Amino acid sequence: VKENESHINVRDVNDGYYLRLYEDEVNLIKDEAYSHMIKEITTDAGVQNVSDISINFDPLYESLTIHHISVWRDGKQIDKMQKNAFKVLANEKDLAMFVYHGSYSAYIILDDIRKGDRLEYDYTISGSNPIYNKKFASSHYFQGTEPIGQIHYSIIAPTTRKLNFKSYNDAPQPDIKTTGSATLYNWDLGTVAGAPNVSNAPAWFDPFQFVQISEYGNWHEVAVWGYNINKPNDKPNGLLGKRISELQEKYGTDTTGLFRAIVSIVQNEVRYMGVEMGPYSHKANDPCKVYNQRYGDCKDKSLLLVSMLHSVGIKADMAIVNTDKIKIEDYLPSPLSFNHAVTLAHVQGKDVWIDATIAGQGGKGTNIYFPCYSKALILSPATTDVIATPEKHGGEIRYTEDYVTGGDESKPVSLTVYTIFTGNKADDMRTYVADQSKAELEKSYQSYYTKIYPHLESTDSVAIIDNKEGDTLETIEKYVITDFYDRDNSNHEYSADFYASMISRQMPQTDNNKKYPIAVAYPYKIHYTVHVISPNGWTIPPKNERIFRDAYHFSCDLETTGNKLSIDYELEYFKDNIAPKEIAEYANDRKKITDDLLSFSFKNSTDAGTSSSTNSNIFTAVVPVVIVISLFAARIYRARRNRDRNRWY
């Protein structure tokens, strides 16, 4: 395509360069895709960011041809094409998530790149994944967070192939021209402004202009395609067949017990690891192979589970979902709308959803937690549409700190921390504990607290009480603190302060003018309680606060009984986002909660007995177990969110 004059304001450019031209041409007749880019360097930082080229391809079914690499400087073209300088490197960006794709990158480092240069290069990738049976589906974005000088996108297709198009966020429509036996779909855009950065938005929120293209006419076509490449093995042999026979003999007519035993085997005895080369991006390996090797990705484990259940007479189907919870029902039918495989079983008249990639799940029989994945497509010839998955309430975290004081600053304070996890929170914690040594777990807990109380010491090993059938897990920590109080020598008073940061950290900051939803943890429910026992007694009036909204609930209760002070907090979210129309109200609620309701201090005087008061903005008493769970949840969230939609893991 001919390059147009760019109208980019360099004040809007980050990273020291911008795309002056971004061109993609897909030729379905030749089964190839041509790409052409021009990057203009505006600052010295751009030199660092533009001086290498990396092009991804899968050698199992694709071939790469690089046509030109040039630098334009002072109106003159400098040839930078050095084929021998290219290195072909394995590109396993998802290996840390235990997924191996077998894809590669052609990589070159360019010399003598300067501020003001324009780097231009183009290449063609021929071939496509055979798993799609020559059926085309894709999405193309016309907008990013940075401005782009010019965008050209086109598709050349035989007139015999019907392509369906759908535009999102006011994306432009194609110009369509038919010549002979070929149809050209063409988009040509001038300068495109960058879209606003949408930090803290839920994963499903996509504000960018894009077009979806799909050759699939309906969801039935997608379901049949997925079923045909992932048919269950109803009569497994070898080691798997032997294991199934042993289970049938053990459980007899106990169908529910047999079901849960099979689920446990697939979840806990077959580790998560995906080798997704070529067609195995969407096709599962044979269940007997997966069981023998004791590893597999989501579709491997799902098909293994379905096959084992079928072999004992329990009906089950493989299903595909999107872990970002995108509104699949609003999308064109396509396999690319999904990134994860799960299972739907029918056990004694009850529908039970299972994610076979989750290890360590508690509960008994059919009582098993299933994440909120929104919509699913059952891989069955009978499927006609996507269906809703159950919106189950998650588990809870109940966190209690018990402080027993001696009445004056000279006496040590004992601290006992009780944390009870239920449901999926227990599942998460169970996995975390299994990944850590007991010594490391105790070290991390005590290390955290010593940052608040430098002279804190552990008085006992951390107790872990796991009731797997009841799906609860409890931890108990015990410490002694010799520097609990802060002393004010001017008035002979000493004080102690608390702040419920585990509540505030789950309430993201925002302003009243956000035009897009804000992501919050969901499902999420936490109870946080502080007990302080003092022989001096308490003279604090009770306090009760309640905030009920459509998206969340918060409560705070303060009371005293004899020598015991109790402060109880509760926070629960009812959905995964704060809608734009709710943001102003949420921002006001958050300010009130974090400024006025989460902190408490008390003071004792060595001269005049005891006095107590509430206060705010004191110090942060963070809970290490909550930190652990938050970090663990974030790791899983990122791992799932960053998945390539061209694969099912």
Q: Where are the language model's segments positioned?
A:
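A sensor for short, sequence-defined functional sites
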Residues: 1-633
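Cytosolic-side junction of a single-pass transmembrane alpha-helix
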Residues: 632-640
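Cytoplasmic C-terminal tails of single-pass
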Residues: 641-649
